[in-house]
């Protein structure tokens, strides 16, 4: 039977990872290693200056752990190299995240980092995120669509193989709409996320200042010389976005011009 490792950055008790396990439990043998507490926007952080404690969850056949103060990268690293080192995983899936991970947000994302760590460890990996919307904030969030999308993706991977070669992963974002409103998947590049420069300053009861970061509206624009719809555009039209991500961050288009620039510096 196929074996899938699940993680997330919302924490072991988050609704998203429970929905993910529920969606896949009849398709594969499921293992879960997730942070004990929320670790959103922790990026690829891995713990090397403090010990990690792994708590085995009772009643889960020894396949569930939560990592005290661990990050998603910690969880995947520890799962593959120690907790389940005799298990050959077919997939690592990180999610279902509460909120989008599109454009440059993928660099900050703990959810995407969990899938990146799986890729680094040599396992085909997927990050999946559920878009939240202010207009639906008074409606209970449903993972029905995200569950269907991940089921279809995993089924296709098990049947036809993982679609990417090398150190690459799939990043999936699911629109906040019903199954009836859903228009299908789009293969997209990352969009260009627009960030504000605001910092929200507050004062506590002791009259000391504290700050909130990251409270930015979801705004974007097209990248230069890119005609294809981005992940943002797909979501805006009730499509899911599926974006291939590469761990190699080298800007190959700039290597020659950088060499020329450097030669000029040496003269």
From Swiss-Prot:
Nucleotide-binding found in the keyword field: yes
A GO molecular-function annotation: nucleotide binding
Positions that bind a divalent metal cation: 9-10, 40, 97
Cofactor annotation remark: Binds 1 divalent metal cation per subunit.
Biological role: Nucleotidase that shows phosphatase activity on nucleoside 5'-monophosphates.
Cellular component terms per the entry's GO annotation: cytoplasm
Keywords associated with the record: Cytoplasm, Hydrolase, Metal-binding, Nucleotide-binding
Gene name tied to this protein: surE
Enzyme Commission number(s) from the entry: 3.1.3.5
Name of this protein: 5'-nucleotidase SurE
Pfam hit, one: SurE
